Amino acid sequence: MDIKHYMHTVGRQARAASRRLAGATTAEKNAALLAIAAAIRRESAALVAANQEDLTAARAAGLETAMLDRLTLSAKGVESMAEGVEQVATLADPIGEMTDIKYRPSGIQVGKMRVPLGVIGIIYEARPNVTADAAALCLKSGNAAILRGGSEAIRSNRAIAALVHEGLKAAGLPAESVQVIDTTDRAAVGELITMREFVDVIVPRGGKGLIARLLAESRVPMIQHLDGNCHVYLEAEADPAKALKIVENAKTQRYGTCNTAESLLVDRSVAAMLLPPIAAMLTAKGVEIRGCAETQAIVPNAIAATEEDYYTEYLAPIISVKVVSGIDEAIEHINQYSSHHSEAIITDNHPKAMRFLREVDSASVMINASTRFADGFEYGLGAEIGISTDKIHARGPVGLEGLTSQKWVVLGDGHVRG
């Protein structure tokens, strides 16, 4: 296969489809989404079977446990995928919305209209559900999508893509509105991230290695989805019951997600009280505790944490723990070591909670709630295309609005500039 020729064909088809989608009605887009959801639900067994083939190959290749967790698609997962697509159909269509219309002294009206970005290239690892989520969000926001999933999920992604195409055609929209790159050749990624004439933005979802490569090589603007080294800080006035419940949920509900807590900070004044029950809970659940010297003095089974531990997204039953002198050190530590994804403070002190909100430099900051809430569905955005750790264009969970832009509109009635 001539990868450059193939990718340029995909790009041209996506650009043509994006022009049709920009003018598609809400009814057309919703009809396609509902048809896609129905097809996914109907073919649940076939999707699970395709995914099992991917899993078998992945295990044989020695894929790590966290990646296998992300790759797995059960019948329940297929149903959740269909429901996610249906939910996007219920969301308000942002395209064409006009805001901030104001009269100017000249008599003209000036405002903004929300419009699609155009063609979105999405690069991701494992997680076949991203194929359906991304297709749905791009479609509803009027964008064409070029999807490049991980090679480990190629069979799952092909099966999902076929159902997406079926739904698009049933609604009278171009099948090329959503294209899954049908090759595992890494050269396809190199082409995708340099096709500025066809692709308007790249959304990468993957590990540091992938992001680093794309940052170095991409000629197309990116919305970064970096790793999730998330923190929970137990402040001096943390409620012990809330602290235990939130740490348990944030760390142990799922280990392989980017909104899982990887580091726990505890105020020195309450460490001796809060750490023993939390450590007992974590140990009972098989979580390895890596702590500072003060943590080790309180938790005998904790092993010594290294500097690298505090930077690490484990995606595994491991947590780093550090005792801090107070909120100043907690904020400083988080801003230095976190990936700027999601952080939580547990406290009944409102002024300190508000200071934490203001000063912690992350996409999502929470008070007395689990970091696991950092999710487009939980935020009411519907399925998300990723969680951006960037500051420009979109930050945090990226839903429909994050996949749009605004253009200025001027309304006149024969007005000329004097």
UniProtKB/Swiss-Prot annotation:
Under SUPFAM superfamilies, the record lists: ALDH-like
Q: Which reaction does it catalyse?
A: L-glutamate 5-semialdehyde + phosphate + NADP(+) = L-glutamyl 5-phosphate + NADPH + H(+)
The compartments listed are: Cytoplasm
The record's InterPro entries line, in alphabetical order, gives: Ald_DH/histidinol_DH (IPR016161), Ald_DH_C (IPR016163), Ald_DH_N (IPR016162), Aldehyde_DH_dom (IPR015590), G-glutamylP_reductase_CS (IPR020593), Glu-5-SA_DH (IPR012134), GPR_dom (IPR000965)
One Pfam family linked to the record: Aldedh
Q: Oxidoreductase among the record's keywords?
A: yes
The GO cellular component terms are:
cytoplasm
Instruction: Name its pathway.
Output: Amino-acid biosynthesis; L-proline biosynthesis; L-glutamate 5-semialdehyde from L-glutamate: step 2/2
Q: Belongs to which family?
A: Belongs to the gamma-glutamyl phosphate reductase family.
Q: Give the protein name, as stated in the record.
A: Gamma-glutamyl phosphate reductase
